[in-house]
Amino acid sequence: MVDVQKRKKLLAKAAASASIPAIKGSVPLDSYDIKIIQYKNALYKLNELNRLLNVLVPHLKKKRDNDESYKIIPLVNFILSLCEGPIFNVSPVLAKRYHLLCRFQLIKLSEVQQRLSTNFIDVEGWMFPEEVPLDHYKSCIYNNSLQWKILNSLSCIAQNAIKIYNAKLRQILLERDAYKARSLPFDTSIIEDLLNPVEMTLILDLAVLINDPVRDKSTHSFYKLQWQVMEKLNSCVHSKIFPILRTYYNQLQKFSETRPTSLSNLQKDLPHWEWTLHRIYTFHLRVFSVLCVIISFSRQIFLPNKQHFLDIKTRLSSENVYHYDLIICELMALLSPECDDVTALFELQENLKFWTQTARTDNNSSRTPIFHLQPGLVVELFNNHICKIIPKLRSIMGLLSNWMDCWKYIEKNYKTFDETNDLRENLKEKLERDKALYLEVKNAKSKLKKKPSITKLPASSSPSPSPTSSASPSRQASLESIRTRARAHLASNSSRSPSVSPVRTTFNNKNAETKKSVVSPEKRKLINGRRPRSSSLQSYTNKQQTSYLNSTRHPSIAPPSKLNNQRSNSLQSSTMTLNQKIVQDTVRHLMNKSASTPNPSASSSLAPSPKVSSINNTSSGKSSSTLIANSSDTLAIETLTLDPESNSSELSIKRVRFAGVPPMTEAENPKPTKVGWYKKPAVLHYPPIPASAMIKPLQHKSKYNTLRQEEGFTFRKSLRDGLEWENGESGSETTMMPFGIEIKESTGHRIASKIRSKLR
């Protein structure tokens, strides 16, 4: 039952909203507009019925006159179901005549004179209540003369109802104009898309051709005919009716879920926003009419054939007895006449009465409430009324579709059982087997629904969002960004040693999330949009901090071959530029020399392999990935072992500047602060040359020559240390001076050099 207290509460809110000033440009919904919508709804359907009957009747008569053996019987009983609803309630006499036609009874064809009044149309409907015997129902359907008489009677009462509705519509428009002198005229074209009775086009298909009376009127053919009628209705609802209703339902849903509920959102999300309340009531009335047609068709087919669907032989011929019994029980609860008070149809009737419910005023006169357009009222009407309508309609159509599928399977696989067979025992055994199978499949489907559809990917910055939150979807990290972060993480870990030996790395999502949550003050400044000071105005300490923050965001290093192509800084002196070019040329010469004579220990252990990347998942839960890349200078192989929590599909190679030289530190690789700027090379502060290395001919007074001498000494020393480490030589006391001069280095100098290297 519908909650009466909730309806009264909504009615009180609607009455209270009458004192609220209306939104400028909106049109309130009152009793006059509700009556106009009711009259137009009936006129749309009756005019379409009259038009299609004028097309169908001459066509059938022409076929019958040309060929007497060509016998087509119109299925008027199903055409009457298309007219189900409150459209004939405009007159009690017409409503009674319509009910008699649905019982295959003839009526008087005299015109009904209705007293002119502008009352609300009663939404109470009538739905084929009796369970007529199957033989009587079948004989009436195949009775050609009876069907033609009922068809003519239906055309007469439809024309009579059209006259009454037109008179009522003219009168209510006059009353509305007199009551609302300056109000906008009610343009019914704004609700025409919702009121268009597209289901009436089924009238042209509701006829049966009889060639062989014995075969075409058999029980099997009769069941097939009814199944085809339901199939046409089901197809019409899904292809023509649902798209129109779904479009406006989605628009209302989008507006009701948008926060805040403002007038701008109302104007943006809803078509004809000034008439939103009129369209909501029209939508409600349209869904009620469609549901009346669906239930009337279903009752007219299910109730006469009820014993056939409950028969033991029919149940044994079904694919799954347990599933079939569940569907039949739900159909009986929905379509049985004694269950009218609990059906969705009754709830819709009560909800429609809410709009026309009258209230008593202070002077003891009755009036209907006036609904002023407010965003909050639209949201409340959607949440309390409309959001419950469409799910019920979908569930009913889903139930009917399942019933039709079972019925089709039964008719194709109907079995003939001997009388000697124990049908009840067979049914009991089949029911137990099918129940176990049905529950097993249902549990499997429920597990699949609960299983997340998105696998958890390892990300060094943020965990993957939950796939089950569809109401408020979060921004998910793309696969390319995850791979890029994984490459940066691997490159930073593997670049700590210049060796070519395999590197074993383990991803840890928790550590990555912890690191992400820590934001440095400098980075917070960058986030807030404040530009750091110019590099020429910063001290050495500030430059180191800024370059460290920038290098952590962009750890990629340009290859040596591209260093010469970079544009120099305009603030850098020409001597420093020349110094850099000399160092780069020397390094390139050494790299070519080392590439021509590769290390035998490394080359012997490496087999030629194509440039591929693969991931092998082992049974222990760990995945090993080997990536091989062949560059112009070196060949590097990295074998990575991932823990079970990580799933990485692409790894990266360690990148270094050249052989024997460790990668740039964070302070050496600053990132430009603006898009399009190139990176200014950091000023290198080399350790002073030891006193024992200061040879008199190489001492220069120029500042830049001294800096070049320190730089050359440092690079020569690092190259020598790298070569000694690769060849396994240690403890050598000779030191390589710039330009190939060998000197002896004391123990104190070696200790000081180690301390300085650690402090760096």
Swiss-Prot record:
Record keyword Cytoplasm present: yes
Sequence positions bearing Phosphoserine: 497, 501, 609
Membrane spanning residue stretches: none
Keywords: Cytoplasm, Phosphoprotein
Domain of life assignment: Eukaryota
Alphabetical GO biological process terms: chromosome segregation
Biased composition (Basic and acidic residues): 512-525
Entry keyword Phosphoprotein: yes
GO molecular function: protein phosphatase 1 binding; protein phosphatase regulator activity
First and last residue of the signal peptide: none
Record-level GO cellular component terms: cytoplasm
Region (Disordered): 449-573, 593-626
Protein location: Cytoplasm
Oligomer and partners: Interacts with GLC7.
Note, other: Present with 227 molecules/cell in log phase SD medium.
Name of the protein described by the UniProt record: GLC7-interacting protein 4
High-level lineage: Eukaryota, Fungi, Dikarya, Ascomycota, Saccharomycotina
